[in-house]
A protein has these predicted regions:
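Short, strongly hydrophobic alpha-helical membrane anchors
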Residues: 1-5, 69-76
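Hydrophobic alpha-helical bundles that form the membrane domains of multi-pass transporters
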Residues: 182-239, 243-244, 248-250, 257-260, ...
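N-terminal transmembrane alpha-helices
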Residues: 4-18, 22-23, 40
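Non-cytoplasmic
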Residues: 24-35, 229-245, 258, 573-588
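Transmembrane alpha-helix interface/packing and boundary motifs in multi-pass membrane proteins
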Residues: 25-35, 239, 255-264, 378-388, ...
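Glycine-rich phosphate-binding loops of nucleotide-dependent enzymes
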Residues: 34-37, 202
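Alpha-helical membrane-interface segments at transmembrane helix boundaries
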Residues: 5-13, 109, 131, 162, ...
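Transmembrane alpha-helices and adjacent helix-loop boundaries
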Residues: 17, 40-43, 47, 63-66, ...
Length: 684
């Protein structure tokens, strides 16, 4: 028991980090009414600024040179030829946090203030993708280590327990309590704090009293980004710095912020510290002999924030504060697919052209785009038609990929794997069917909270679910087999005696897989068209528009949500199995939450309510038909897609496919005018 208590004490440090991030989320929500999914990235970028200043004396700005050559945009400031001390680096990082606060308010959340909730979500996700990709481009994706600013030293045998805890962890928790308590007093006693509370209660009422909502939002965003950046710097003493790791710290921070009802900075602080304590203590139970091996330590750690978020959402539900609800009826358009047969014909023509004239690289890109299109169709059903913002569709695909591979394995060593993958050796069609069914079951499990919540709150649940499921299922060697955490080889698939793939050591051409994937894409398009044009599609759109009105018309809202998630999960599962066939070796990083967010972002760029939008997003997907070959080019493309996603949220939430709407409107008007003239001539 003493070991568990010691681990709980060690969790105070990371809990302090969660607490400050959660406090930043609460402050941003009080000022703008937005739950910021970008909070972890706002801690990550100043932390990289601190590390870079310590190592090289360079200070990078959160942009890059978009037009190298004719117009040189400064993106780096060299303050010293070598690294500088901790204090100048700390001040530079805090200054960077202030810059981020100004940019976030002026360029993103300020213009989105009177936009519908879906646009705010798109903008928040765009900022997350932009900062994460930009950090990977400027600083690299490898782990960075540097001495922080907190004093060194260890408190040996605290409270008579064996072991020790760093003073840095205790100090970070203490700083979190000071920040949380100080902000609680600030919002109760200061003039700006009282004005913030007035705007928070009623934006219209506060505006009528003469308070500037924009000014109040700016002040609160500056506070939020500053304390978040400070947290990112202080946590460097015991947290490994990578773009992905820091960005995903937003998940436990969201759980702590919800503990404070998104309104109380003090309760969010307490929730963050308790969450860190519970996570660390729970990991100690996995070291016991009686603990089941199929529940890994990291999976349990990631499941705790998910459980906290689900419990809070279920108990509080619609009582959680949501601003901007008067714009909730504005949803991206989801028109009936009219020219879908033309689209299918174009897909067949492109496939034939690539089969006969394309290189092996082009064939691989076509396969990637085809699979991405199926995955994005799953999001079209759930997000575009049903109106439920799910960020876990790629996770559903990963579940199907891993479990179908395990079910098809027979104990042989496949490909370049160093491990024999044990399994029942089921035929590939049956293994695929079972893998998709399991993905549907996982999707329905994640969909249960959607019965009670929706919008950004559901996005929070699905994001936490994606993080937890990745570790519990895909990273679980007891469930998946050896190689789950590194490289898991896929058994060569055979369908009715036909080899779907070819050994890469023999040939890079994969004509059979191209035909196989295109057939599945055509089937999925046909299914989605049938859903949209049928009774099910009308029910989905009714639920998306107004759940209460749909219920009054006899629509089973809960059943419609579960059905939508089931269909979307099935489509995602198909995409996952096809990805396994293509890659032949599965890596857990392919299916993480950030990759899933990137997939959804490309769909938003194309048009989330359109089948054609899924096709546009699939063309833009990494390693797709319109991708670049260099890794640097891929990162820059992802960064640009994040910036473009923000622009889409502000100016055109229907996506790039809606750019043709004015042309279609003019053509329709021209045809109507011509028809009218012909009618008049006939009458004469």
């Amino acid at each position: 028991m003493s070991e568990i208590l010691m681990l709980c004490i060690l969790g105070i440090g990371i809990g302090g980090f969660y607490a400050i991030l959660a406090t930043g989320i609460v402050v941003g929500h009080k000022g703008s009414g937005l739950i910021n999914l970008d909070q972890g990235a706002l801690a990550m970028y100043p932390a990289y600024t601190f590390v870079t200043m310590r190592e090289t004396g360079d200070m990078y700005f959160p942009w890059f040179d978009f037009f190298p050559g004719p117009i040189d945009i400064p993106y780096k400031l060299s303050l010293a030829s070598t690294g500088v001390g901790a204090l100048p680096s700390f001040l530079a990082a805090v200054f960077m946090s202030i810059i981020l606060g100004i940019i976030v308010q002026m360029l993103i959340f300020g213009p989105l203030r009177n936009k519908p909730p879906i646009s705010k979500i798109i903008g928040s996700l765009g900022a997350l993708i932009y900062l994460t990709s930009l950090a990977s481009y400027q600083f690299g994706s490898k782990s960075r280590f540097v001495d922080g600013v907190l004093p060194e030293g260890i408190w040996q045998n605290p409270f008579g327990l064996d072991g020790g805890i760093e003073y840095a962890r205790l100090l970070l928790a203490l700083i979190a309590l000071i920040i949380g308590g100080g902000l609680a007093i600030y919002y109760k006693r200061s003039k700006m704090g009282l004005r913030t509370r007035a705007i928070e209660d009623s934006e219209i009422g506060g505006t009528l009293l003469g308070f500037s909502a924009n000014k109040i939002a700016t002040v609160n965003w500056l506070i939020s980004t500053t304390i978040t950046g400070i947290a990112g710097i202080l946590a460097l003493d015991f947290v490994t710095l990578t773009p992905t790791r820091y960005t995903l710290f937003v998940v436990p921070a969201l759980g702590a912020a919800l503990f404070g009802n998104l309104t109380s900075a003090w309760m969010a602080t307490i929730g963050g510290i308790l969450l860190g304590v519970f996570q660390s203590g729970a990991a100690g139970f996995t070291l016991k002999g009686w603990w089941p091996a199929w529940i890994p330590s990291e999976g349990l750690r990631q499941a705790i924030p998910l459980l906290v978020i689900i419990v809070i959402q279920f108990t509080k539900g619609y009582r959680l504060p949501v601003r901007g609800t008067r714009f909730a009826d504005r949803q991206p358009r989801a028109p009936k697919p009219i020219r879908w047969k033309t689209l299918c014909t174009a897909i067949v023509c492109i496939a034939i052209w690539v089969l006969f004239t394309g290189s092996s690289v082009t064939q691989g890109r076509l396969i990637t785009s085809t699979i991405a299109a199926i995955l994005m169709l799953s999001s079209v059903v759930i997000i575009g038609y049903l109106g439920q913002l799910s960020l876990a569709n790629l996770t559903f695909a990963g579940v199907a990929a891993y479990l179908s591979s395990r079910l098809a394995a027979d104990g042989s060593v496949y490909g370049f794997s160093a491990f024999a993958l044990e399994g029942p050796g089921l035929p590939s069609p049956i293994a695929m069917l079972l893998g998709v069914c399991i993905a549907v079951a996982v999707g329905l499990l994640i969909a249960i909270p959607a019965v009670r919540i929706r919008g950004l709150q559901l996005a929070v649940v699905t994001l936490a679910g994606a993080v937890a499921i990745t570790e519990i299922v895909m990273g679980n060697e007891s469930l998946i087999g050896k190689g789950a955490q590194s490289n898991l080889s896929v058994p060569p698939p055979q369908w009715f005696g036909v080899d779907i793939t070819v050994d890469p050591s023999i040939s890079r051409d994969r004509p059979t897989l191209i035909i196989f994937c295109c057939i599945w894409l055509l089937l999925c398009i046909t299914a989605v068209v049938g859903i949209r044009n049928g009774v099910t599609g009308r029910k989905f759109l009714a639920v998306r528009s107004n759940e209460r009105a749909a219920s009054s018309l006899g629509v089973n809202v809960a059943g419609a949500k579960l059905l939508g998630f089931g269909i979307g999960s099935a489509l995602a599962g198909v995409a996952g199995v096809l990805t396994a066939y293509q890659q032949t070796v599965l890596q857990i990083t392919t299916w993480d939450a950030l990759s899933g967010i990137g997939n959804v972002s490309l769909l938003f760029l194309g048009g989330v309510g359109h089948i054609g939008g899924a096709m546009i997003g699939a063309l833009l997907t990494p390693a797709g038909l319109l991708s670049t070959t260099s890794s640097e080019g891929q990162i820059l493309r992802t960064t640009a897609s994040g910036a473009l996603m923000i622009a889409i949220a502000i100016f055109r939430s229907d996506g790039l496919i809606s750019l043709t709407d004015p042309i279609k409107k003019k053509l329709t008007q021209s045809r109507s005018s011509l028809f009218k003239q012909n009618t008049e001539v006939t009458k004469q």
